[in-house]
UniProtKB/Swiss-Prot annotation:
Any one GO CC term of the record: cytoplasm
Protein name per the record: Beta-apo-4'-carotenal oxygenase
Domain of life per record: Eukaryota
Organismal lineage: Eukaryota, Fungi, Dikarya, Ascomycota, Pezizomycotina
CDD domains for the chain: ALDH_F14-YMR110C
Name of one Pfam family that matches: Aldedh
Organism whose genome encodes this protein: Neurospora crassa (strain ATCC 24698 / 74-OR23-1A / CBS 708.71 / DSM 1257 / FGSC 987)
Induction: Is not regulated by light unlike the genes responsible for the preceding reactions in the carotenoid pathway.
Gene that this polypeptide is encoded by: ylo-1
């Protein structure tokens, strides 16, 4: 379905002097406590769901205008994706928000009604990126609404049509005192960062993410950073090469490769490297029978600056282009391109491409592949592994990443119910599904001590009485089942607890079954003796 012709308002920067009032209103709304009401949150989420439906044509037209993103991807990866995310939050919010009773307590504290209340953090700032300008702004908003927070949203100025379409949608359908959109560039972002927030959610580059984190640290503001990295793909000789090529090709053409989780390079066993490259060419032809440039499905690079950044990588590489290579600045078009390299110093290996280009680096062994990947970027946002089970398990064991995908290209980050996040310098924190709710929630431990219990709490009051402490310790302190060398020891106490059925699998039910067997065995033995007599 093609994006409809829709008029989108010209990009309008929020006046700097208006920003403090916008933030103050959001804080005042949170302070009114109305967002803590679960029904209020559900109403806002339902309104957002239908707003996405009603503004779908506008949002898809904006995506076409900003990224030349086709209707298929706009619907599948942006608008419809967020609608499903909304429904998941709506359908599960009561469960997510339910107070948890704590049960793993010493018996002496079991009457104190320990529980964990899920409380909203407060007023949050959501700063979005340009690559998925709808999904990666509104998915965090779904979590913030579900958690009971108010939010100020700062979309990317690099996708101005999407920013204006979202501003109109959000401020016309949601509670304007609770949710607002601030548009602009660096000055407006700086002004927002001068405000006090209860959490900041940022999706974008590591360079800007570090600036956000440093500024947030000045006021001890927690942040969730979704960044990126030089993500590796591993292809061993035991992999299904045709499948690996097809799925990795998809990972580099979706949104023209402007995906933070897409692979930057492929470490392929040198014995199958040529075959893998041939399968890449077949996959390319299958996806673009008339060439990538003529395809209505392939997006374009967001702007000339990023086009030239990617072009520079291809211009300066010492490697061999084995697929693609065509570029057209007038259209911001870069053909899906694979470059065969033999040096870690090659520009293709030194920078995150964030586009439809990637390098292929042949390796002798999986040992070498893992060594290279850990050297290039120890904590990437994603890794993709194609091989047999022992190989993929080893890759998971010996390399850290925000997420990982076996036999596919970053699909671990495509499902709205599954936590998504980075690790190390590829990001902090996670969101989506329940993780989105948790991301904007404070888990508040509450205890409630009955007034009548004071007679049993003499142990904590001065003057202290050692005999009372020893008595308490006998009731509350558990004994270790291991010695000083860390070896588990099964002494007499273990066997006593085993036969009583406590602390073992099955618990009381297991104990009853064991004792029934013992008793039945006893009576059967007695019966047999009586028969023989």
């Amino acid at each position: 379905m093609a994006a409809s012709k829709v008029e989108i308002a010209p990009f309008e920067v929020t006046p700097l002097d208006a920003i403090p009032a916008v933030c103050s209103t959001a804080r005042a709304t949170f302070a009114s406590h109305k967002t803590k009401n679960l029904q209020w949150r559900l109403v806002q989420l339902r309104k957002l769901y239908w707003a996405l439906d009603d503004f779908k044509a506008s949002l898809m037209a904006a995506l076409q205008q900003d990224l030349r993103k086709g209707g298929y991807e706009s619907d599948f990866t942006e608008v419809d994706w967020v609608k499903n995310d909304c429904l998941h939050m709506i359908n599960n919010l009561e469960t997510f928000a339910k107070t948890e009773k704590l049960k793993d307590l010493p018996v002496t504290y079991s009457m104190m009604n320990f529980r964990v209340k899920k409380e909203p953090l407060g007023t949050v700032l959501i700063i979005g990126p340009y690559n998925f300008p709808i999904q990666l702004v509104l998915a965090p908003l779904v979590g913030a609404i579900g958690a009971g927070c108010t939010a100020v949203i700062k979309p990317s100025e690099l996708t101005p049509a999407c920013a204006m379409a979202m501003k109109e949608m959000i401020e016309s359908r949601l509670d304007r005192d609770a949710f607002a959109v601030v548009n602009g560039g660096v000055p407006e972002t700086n002004a927002l960062m001068e405000e006090k927030w209860d959490k900041i959610m940022f999706t974008g580059s590591a360079q800007v993410g570090s600036i956000i984190a440093r500024k947030a640290a000045e006021t001890l503001t927690p942040v969730c950073l979704e960044l990126g990295g030089r993500n590796p793909a591993f292809v061993t000789k035991k992999a299904n090469l045709a499948l690996a090529a097809r799925r990795l090709m998809w990972g580099k053409v979706l949104n023209a490769g402007q995906v933070c989780m897409s692979h930057n390079y492929v470490l392929v066993d040198k014995d199958v490297a040529d075959t893998f490259i041939e399968f890449l060419k077949i996959a390319y032809k299958d996806m673009f029978p008339n060439g990538a440039k003529a395809s209505p499905d392939l997006s374009r690079i967001v702007n000339a600056r990023h086009f030239n950044r990617i072009k520079k990588m291809l211009d300066e590489t010492k490697g061999k282009i084995v697929m693609g290579g065509e570029m057209d600045e007038s259209e911001l078009y870069i053909e899906p391109t694979a470059v065969l390299v033999d040096s870690l110093d090659d520009p293709m290996m030194q920078e995150e491409s964030f586009g439809p280009i990637f390098s292929i680096y042949p390796v002798d062994t999986l040992d070498q592949a893992l060594s290279i990947a850990n050297n290039v970027h120890r904590t990437p946002l994603a890794l993709m592994a194609f091989g047999d089970k022992s190989e993929t398990n080893r890759i998971l064991d010996e390399m850290t990443s925000g997420g990982a995908c076996i036999n596919d290209s970053y699909f671990h980050g495509a499902v709205h119910t599954v936590p998504f996040g980075g690790v190390g310098d590829s990001g902090w924190g996670a969101y989506r599904g329940k993780a989105s709710f948790d991301n904007f929630t404070h888990f508040r431990t509450v205890s409630e001590t009955p007034t009548w219990m004071d007679r049993f709490l003499r142990v904590r009051y001065m003057p202290y009485d050692w005999s009372e402490l020893r008595l308490l310790q006998r009731w509350t302190n558990k004994k270790p089942n291991f010695d000083r060398q860390g070896t588990v020891a099964k002494g007499s106490e273990y066997w006593m607890w085993y036969f009583l059925g406590l602390g073992t699998k099955g618990g009381v039910k297991g104990a009853l079954m064991r004792w029934l067997v013992v008793v039945a065995g006893y009576y059967l033995s007695a019966y047999m003796k009586a028969r023989r007599a």
